[in-house]
Amino acid sequence: MIRFNRAIRPFSVMSFDLDDTLYNNHPIIKAAVSAQQNYLNALPRYQEQGPQYWQKCRQLAALQQPELKDNVTQWRKHTLHLALSKLGFTEQEVALHASNAYNAFADARSNIVVSDDVLALLDNLAQHFTLIAITNGNDCNLCILGRFPSCAIAYRCACFDLFHINHTCF
């Protein structure tokens, strides 16, 4: 049994993680990876590297900069630059194709389907609470959930502490 020695004040904020909380994330990630891969496979020299090339570059990126493992967005972007650079693309081509490949991933990543029941529940909760979405990859402005959260908090590192957030977003 939990015992409180002080009165608990009413809640004014409700936070939640998007992935697998409000919708099934597995098909979303699969589609996002596929969208990125489709873009990359259309580039000369990329498809010739085989299906393991992305994984090898991803592992190399993590070895070069281990802190990237704590920020999946930056890890993906760095891996894209590394993979394209290794294939001999110019700096300008690397920048262009890395950006386009990432955008293909991000657009598909934000193409989520939330059931009408969940949307109705969120509408109801938004009448009473400030809703906050915690995410490490979604762009709330690109998906249907952008109409709900007052502030989207992106996970940036393993030491991230929610108590150090700038409270002006509330």
Regions found by a protein language model. Give the residues of each.
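Hydrophobic (often cysteine-bearing) scaffold residues that line and stabilize catalytic clefts
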Residues: 25, 29, 72, 76, ...
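Conserved Lys-Pro-Asp/Glu-containing loop-to-beta segment of HAD-superfamily phosphomonoesterases
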Residues: 152, 161-170
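Substrate-recognition element of Asp-dependent hydrolases with the DxDx(T/V) motif
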Residues: 96-111, 118-160
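Amphipathic coiled-coil/heptad-repeat helices and related helical stalk/stem segments
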Residues: 1, 114-118, 165
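Active-site neighborhood of HAD-like aspartate-dependent phosphohydrolases
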Residues: 2-56
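Hydrophobic alpha-helical core bundles mediating ligand binding, dimerization, or RNAP-core interactions
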Residues: 29-37, 54-58, 76, 80, ...
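A metal-dependent, Asp-based hydrolase signature
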Residues: 59-102
